[in-house]
Amino acid sequence: MMNDALTSLACSLKPGTTIKGKWNGNTYTLRKQLGKGANGIVYLAETSDGHVALKVSDDSLSITSEVNVLKSFSKAQSVTMGPSFFDTDDAYIPSANTKVSFYAMEYIKGPLLLKYVSDKGAEWIPVLMIQLLSSLSVLHQQGWIFGDLKPDNLIVTGPPARIRCIDVGGTTKEGRAIKEYTEFYDRGYWGYGTRKAEPSYDLFAVAMIMINSVHKKEFKKTNQPKEQLRSLIEGNPLLQKYKKALFSALNGDYQSADEMKKDMLDAGQKAAQRKQPIKASPQPATRQRQQKPRQGKITKTRYTPKQKPAKSGGLFETTLIVISVLALYFAYIIFFLI
């Protein structure tokens, strides 16, 4: 929820407003508001080089913290997770009679995660989560925990499909207290642990994102939250395939994102193998008997054309081809894009 100062600032920064940096002198023309949070507002802005996403805030410390996170992403060569960083500066807004801090970053275009899954199908959920775990692994190795990990902060770009994060406001140094979180994806809310910034905190959120992606809505916890989540996982065919990874993530058993990723990959491969039907052995062809000609008469052997295979055989082969193509595409996504 925004404070009063940010609410006033949002009213002042309308489409068409131009912001000029005090120190670097770069100019940004606001086109529309993309989102807002507890510590700032994000706009689509236009520059001489194209479009950027511009985050504006009256809290210079929060801007500095987020800039450090984006720079860390770049150093770790993990820009595929978060947006690329371009510029940071201060500016004076005459219409609001206030000084603001801002930073410019890559404008990431694409549908939000839940929209993408709704359009393309639930089979994309594990593929995208495996990609997310790859990015989280790099982030954690740099000493950062994403914190406020949720579908509203995840966009799918492409083709080829690639999951990206669009808000690093909750990213926290490992070992500290998580500074921003959303209850539904927070392990403290569900009674599974503390809000200490550590890899297992993010992995709990990944499990909740998978549950939310399947059930398509957030829900309130009951008086038995752990049993509630267990029932939701075991009661859904897709989630059940990955229940080992999901239960381990919920219980905080993983020490790294790579461990969860391995279990997800193993579960996906087992599910793909179970889908492939076993091809029946072909029946040996029976030779057509030739009638022995009677003596004194020449008997022509009648030619009998081979019977066409039944339609069910063609359907079987078509099904096998489709499954093989899907398996190859799944492997392509995992081994070439992750």
Swiss-Prot record:
<keyword id="KW-0597">Phosphoprotein</keyword>
<feature type="active site" description="Proton acceptor">
    <location>
        <position position="148"/>
    </location>
</feature>
<dbReference type="GO" id="GO:0106310">
    <property type="term" value="F:protein serine kinase activity"/>
</dbReference>
<keyword id="KW-0808">Transferase</keyword>
<dbReference type="GO" id="GO:0004674">
    <property type="term" value="F:protein serine/threonine kinase activity"/>
</dbReference>
<feature type="domain" description="Protein kinase">
    <location>
        <begin position="28"/>
        <end position="286"/>
    </location>
</feature>
<dbReference type="InterPro" id="IPR017441">
    <property type="entry name" value="Protein_kinase_ATP_BS"/>
</dbReference>
<protein>
    <recommendedName>
        <fullName>Serine/threonine-protein kinase YabT</fullName>
        <ecNumber>2.7.11.1</ecNumber>
    </recommendedName>
</protein>
<feature type="binding site">
    <location>
        <position position="55"/>
    </location>
    <ligand>
        <name>ATP</name>
    </ligand>
</feature>
<comment type="similarity">
    <text>Belongs to the protein kinase superfamily. Ser/Thr protein kinase family.</text>
</comment>
<comment type="function">
    <text>Plays a role in the cell's commitment to sporulation; phosphorylates DNA replication initiation-control protein YabA. Deletion of this kinase delays entry into sporulation but does not affect final spore yield. Overexpression decreases biofilm formation; phosphorylation of YabA probably prevents biofilm formation.</text>
</comment>
<dbReference type="InterPro" id="IPR000719">
    <property type="entry name" value="Prot_kinase_dom"/>
</dbReference>
<keyword id="KW-0547">Nucleotide-binding</keyword>
<dbReference type="InterPro" id="IPR011009">
    <property type="entry name" value="Kinase-like_dom_sf"/>
</dbReference>
<keyword id="KW-0418">Kinase</keyword>
<dbReference type="Pfam" id="PF00069">
    <property type="entry name" value="Pkinase"/>
</dbReference>
<feature type="compositionally biased region" description="Basic residues">
    <location>
        <begin position="289"/>
        <end position="309"/>
    </location>
</feature>
<dbReference type="GO" id="GO:0005524">
    <property type="term" value="F:ATP binding"/>
</dbReference>
<feature type="binding site">
    <location>
        <begin position="34"/>
        <end position="42"/>
    </location>
    <ligand>
        <name>ATP</name>
    </ligand>
</feature>
<keyword id="KW-0723">Serine/threonine-protein kinase</keyword>
<feature type="region of interest" description="Disordered">
    <location>
        <begin position="266"/>
        <end position="312"/>
    </location>
</feature>
<keyword id="KW-0067">ATP-binding</keyword>
